[in-house]
Amino acid sequence: MSEKKIYGPDVYKRNEHGLLENVDYEFNEDGSVNWRAMIKEEFLYPNKDWFASRKKDVPTSVEGLSDKQLLIMLGGIKELAKMRGYHTIDFKVDNISDGYVTAKCQIDWIENYESSFGGISSRYTDVANATLANTDNFCAKFLETIACNRAFVRCVRNYL
């Protein structure tokens, strides 16, 4: 007998602990979710700069690499945020000067067993920038977007 396929709202149905019912979570020894282990391999790739700085060949696979040898695609961070669950994500962008943009990302996370505050969601904020000095020529046209993406990634990564 095959398992019933989950559709629509059931994909995001949560249990009494705030965890998605259809996800097999990995946990740390202290009982917290091992969010790093929850990132699918399809969202990981070798950190070319790490290998170049050590004059090593960049591997073609992420298998066996340590966290410092890996980078996570934006899609992996987005998936983690959806898995963790949030109420809102808000951005505030400031064009400080020509070629210098800052972004603040604020996420109101849903309550779960890791952050139980009596029915109150937890809020986390982080900031990032994008400048002509820390992006390439192509990206210079998208400083606001890059700053927002960086702030979002920091917000998710540093909260989890």
Residue ranges with predicted function:
Residues 1-160:
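Glycine-rich anion-binding surface patch
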